[in-house]
Each structure stands twice: as C-alpha cells, then as structure tokens.
Swiss-Prot record:
InterPro entries assigned to the protein according to its UniProt record, in alphabetical order: Ribosomal_uL22 (IPR001063), Ribosomal_uL22_bac/chlpt-type (IPR005727), Ribosomal_uL22_bac/org-type (IPR047867), Ribosomal_uL22_CS (IPR018260), Ribosomal_uL22_sf (IPR036394)
Name the UniProt record assigns to this protein: Large ribosomal subunit protein uL22
UniProt subunit comment: Part of the 50S ribosomal subunit.
Organism of derivation: Beijerinckia indica subsp. indica (strain ATCC 9039 / DSM 1715 / NCIMB 8712)
GO molecular function per UniProt: rRNA binding; structural constituent of ribosome
Alphabetic keyword roster: Ribonucleoprotein, Ribosomal protein, RNA-binding, rRNA-binding
GO CC terms, sorted: cytosolic large ribosomal subunit
Family of the protein in this entry: Belongs to the universal ribosomal protein uL22 family.
KW rRNA-binding (keyword) present: yes
Cited Gene3D superfamilies: Ribosomal protein L22/L17
C-alpha cells in the first residue's frame, strides 16, 4: 500500500515556489523579501528588476516560478495575483578558516538561506472591500 497523499496546505486560490540553499545570509535576503511582500506581482517584478541587491535576481526567478505555477498548475489569472507571503528561513552555515598572523586562524562563516514565495489570486470585489 502506498502512503496517503497529504492534503494541500495552500488554498485553492494560491500557489507557491521555493528556492533552497541560496548563498546569502537570511538577513540580507529578508531585506529583498520585504520589498515585494503584499504587492501585485507585476509591481513586485518591476521592483526586483531595478533593485541593486545581488540576490534580487534569485528572488525574481522564484517569483516568476510561483507565477508560472499559479498559471499552469492551478489555472489562476496572472493579472489578479498578489504576493501573499514571502518568507525566509535559515539553512546551513559553511565554516571556513582563514590564516591569520602568528600561526593563528580566523573563522569565516558562509551562511545559506531558503526563500518561499506564496502568490494569491484576489478578485476585484475582494480587493475593493
């Protein structure tokens, strides 16, 4: 017997995309995630396009993936999508050593982060209310 399928954790009007192991600290990634949270997807894509942060490119790719998931997998209207959630999680931290003076060593930490973006379709009635 196969394992029972877990119920869908998102609503019928939602879709999500996840980017894992992004080579950036969660604090820096969260700055870009805050930039798009709650906005319409076309405005969020424009903001990411002109952001000067290095990680904005990866966030934009993840948002485009969430939009494609909404359109192709869940048949949602792209024009009515907003970024419902954009949250960041901590991943592993690579530890490296840097040689220092007089035979000592310094520790360098290279953090990684996960990014989850959830887009939601809102109707004109719900947006106006």
């Amino acid at each position: 017997m196969s394992k029972e399928k877990t119920p869908r954790s998102l609503g019928d009007n939602e879709a999500k995309a996840v980017a894992r192991m992004l080579r950036v600290s969660p604090q820096k990634l969260n700055l870009v995630a805050q930039l798009i949270r709650g906005k319409k997807v076309d405005k969020a894509l424009a903001d990411l396009e002109f952001s000067r942060k290095r990680i904005a490119y990866d966030v934009k790719k993840t948002l485009e993936s969430a939009i494609a998931n909404a359109e192709n997998n869940h048949s949602l209207d792209v024009d009515d999508l907003i970024v419902a959630e954009a949250f960041v999680g901590k991943a592993m931290v690579m530890k490296r050593f840097s040689p220092r003076a007089r035979g000592r060593s310094g520790r360098i930490e290279k953090p990684f982060a996960h990014l989850t973006i959830v887009v939601r379709e809102v109707t004109a009635v719900a947006a106006g209310a």
